[in-house]
């Protein structure tokens, strides 16, 4: 599933190419792609028509386009009171221009400059929905995203406050990193990478990790996702691409995830893999020793 860096790459591409554009036509090719929009495909289509994309937003793994009316008004003066929320799921893609495989095209929106914005999703776990904007902690976010915590790359992310929350959690630190209500944007890949950089085993209880070490871990999470952003995100297959259909290449720089049986880049010990929450955790047994039972 795309994590923060991959979603941010898509957001930046959309911000550059669709901000200020007006939706002139919409077609829903697969109803499952709008299942989260409770009013149904016809309502989503009708409400999207003639709206102007006034901006883009992201909170953790959630992406949205802010929408406004008043096409005759300058963009800066158009009010944005609702948003198109996009969840990429496991394989969702927001593509501009030609779609390489129309079999997986779920939604298409035509913009006033002739560009087509397409939602392509092979596994159909993602989708679009419309939602009102609400104000949470001084920021306007779509209502379904209001419960999602800020992520380590958010300028208003409060590292000290998150450390205090983590210190009260009597469960594994990796479980807490994956909890989007505690800190958002971190999935399995970047959790393992952050834990490796901070030399913490993901099975340790969050409450047993010192405040200083937790702060270091959150800093490592910010660093690794910044590094991933610079390389276009992580692509293990063709399912994650940016708006131009291009894959990222941070997978070549991973230090932990997927490296079972390979030497640790830091100490040379052989990397291991454990099962965790129906996922795999990759770690160095020397740099990140498991907690004693």
UniProtKB/Swiss-Prot annotation:
GO MF term list: 8-oxo-7,8-dihydroguanine DNA N-glycosylase activity; class I DNA-(apurinic or apyrimidinic site) endonuclease activity; damaged DNA binding; zinc ion binding
Zn finger region (FPG-type): 255-289
Cross-referenced Pfam families: Fapy_DNA_glyco (PF01149), H2TH (PF06831), zf-FPG_IleRS (PF06827)
Catalytic residues of the enzyme: 2 (schiff-base intermediate with dna), 3 (proton donor), 61 (proton donor), 279 (proton donor)
GO biological process per UniProt: base-excision repair
PROSITE patterns linked to this entry: FPG_CAT, ZF_FPG_1, ZF_FPG_2
Entry note: cofactor: Binds 1 zinc ion per subunit.
Residues given in the record as DNA binding sites: 104, 123, 169
Reaction it catalyzes: Hydrolysis of DNA containing ring-opened 7-methylguanine residues, releasing 2,6-diamino-4-hydroxy-5-(N-methyl)formamidopyrimidine; 2'-deoxyribonucleotide-(2'-deoxyribose 5'-phosphate)-2'-deoxyribonucleotide-DNA = a 3'-end 2'-deoxyribonucleotide-(2,3-dehydro-2,3-deoxyribose 5'-phosphate)-DNA + a 5'-end 5'-phospho-2'-deoxyribonucleoside-DNA + H(+)
Coiled-coil residue windows: none
Keywords, comma-separated and alphabetical: DNA damage, DNA repair, DNA-binding, Glycosidase, Hydrolase, Lyase, Metal-binding, Multifunctional enzyme, Zinc, Zinc-finger
Family stated for the protein in its record: Belongs to the FPG family.
Assembly with partners or alone: Monomer.
Name the record gives this protein: Formamidopyrimidine-DNA glycosylase
